[in-house]
Amino acid sequence: MERIFRILEETDTKATFFVIGWIAKTYPDIVRQIASKYQVGSHTMNHQLVWQQSREAFKEDVSSSIKLLEDITGQKVEAFRAPGFSIRESEGWAFEILHELGIRMDSSVFPAHHAHGGMPSYVSAVPSWVEYNGIRMKEFPIVYRKILGKHIVFSGGGYFRLVPYRLLRKWTRECPEYLLAYIHPRDLDAEQPMIEDLNYI
């Protein structure tokens, strides 16, 4: 975590840490350390995809994660990201539940097709609002480039490994108003275990 903090501080980068509940329960001191410097948001309790759950199960999962994080940090949790960006067009009800639970900022919209979900019809490339059944919630979507009519996501996770660096740099520089990138702690862990003989695959 110290390496992540150092990089954020040296680059003067704002960050929200979306924390999984069971990890917070296992490492509460790390969560308190994060909360002393940055916003802590919910990443659910058990990292289950939204569309795999009923409304009731999703509400219970997120509610328990919020309560746990608030108990650990002493701060109100108002930010959320769905595991795998798994709020699809058909799961708009999730925003209604999040709003009911006190979430005011979401970062779950993946404005392209995605293995775990995605909202290809979402057209805003900058922070905007999502609406469902009369509720409005601030949305910070994943950044994309429009190429040949398709939304191409590039600013996070495995995309940092798949997209050539020159292209990453070019597209990043072409986002002067808003750039949201996401990483997992393991992405910066030089000691992350590697699969044997992976280089030969």
Language model regions located:
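N-terminal regions that are enriched for targeting/export leaders
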Residues: 1-6
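Active-site-adjacent pocket scaffolds in enzyme catalytic domains
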Residues: 75-76, 82-182
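A generic secondary-structure signal
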Residues: 7, 68-71, 170-171
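Short, hinge-like loop/turn segments at secondary-structure boundaries
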Residues: 33-36, 58-61, 96-99, 124-125, ...
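C-terminal domain-boundary segment and adjacent tail
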Residues: 9-12, 162-201
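Surface-exposed, active-site-proximal loop segments in enzymatic domains
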Residues: 46-57, 152-156, 194-200
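Metal-dependent polysaccharide deacetylase catalytic core of the NodB/CE4 family, i.e.
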Residues: 11-91, 103-104, 108-116, 135-136, ...
